[in-house]
A protein has these predicted regions:
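An amphipathic, aromatic/His-enriched active-site/gating alpha helix that lines ligand/cofactor pockets
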Residues: 1-20, 57-72, 90-129
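Short, well-ordered beta-strand segments in beta-rich or mixed alpha/beta enzyme
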Residues: 1-2, 34-43, 75-105, 139-141
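Surface-exposed beta-loop interaction hotspot
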Residues: 8-49
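Short, conserved secondary-structure transition motifs
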Residues: 21-23, 77-82, 122-133
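Short, low-order "capping/linker" segments at domain edges
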Residues: 25-34, 127-141
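Short acidic, gly/pro-rich beta-turn/loop elements at beta-sheet edges
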Residues: 26, 50-52, 97-99, 135
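Generic detector of short alpha-helix boundary/capping microenvironments
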Residues: 28, 56, 75-77, 113, ...
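Conserved small-residue-rich
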Residues: 34-78
């Protein structure tokens, strides 16, 4: 199913990409947990997609068990020859993201192999603030 988006008159849509979920998400609900969500866009060769999915699946239990983090979704471009993937991961905060750059050995091996199969990657970190989490934020104003 395609979703139609509307934009203000002064916003121009330059391109769109359709993706299908792979192993996750397990549910298709809007995310509501406050924290850091990193959107990691991958360019890959189409014949590497299945191995990247398997490597991710193998690494996630150890990775998630070692840090306050949870993989939200791994998506693949909805074409016959996919060359783009999107990984979305939740982190409690940026400190956890920084700590997770040094995962346990078995997760690290899978991530290193996944990196070898990746032509390039562009991670974008975002923060989701929910009204109930406002009291936990520190203002530097």
């Amino acid at each position: 199913t395609q979703t139609s988006l509307s934009f203000p008159d002064d916003v121009q849509l330059l391109s769109t990409h359709l993706f299908n979920p792979t192993l996750r998400p397990l549910d298709h609900q809007a995310r509501t947990r406050a924290g850091i969500y990193v959107f990691r866009w991958f360019s890959v060769l189409p014949d590497a997609v299945d191995e990247i999915i398997q490597l991710s699946y193998n690494a996630w239990p150890t990775f998630e068990g070692s840090f306050e983090t949870e993989v939200q979704g791994l998506f693949v471009e909805a074409t016959g020859q996919p060359s783009e993937m999107l990984l979305i991961t939740w982190y409690k905060n940026l400190s956890v993201w920084e700590e997770s750059r040094h995962p346990p050995e078995n997760a690290r091996e899978s991530f290193l192999r996944r990196h070898q199969l990746t032509l390039n990657a562009k991670p974008i970190a975002t923060m989701l603030n929910m009204p109930e989490s406002q009291s936990q934020l520190v203002s530097h104003a």
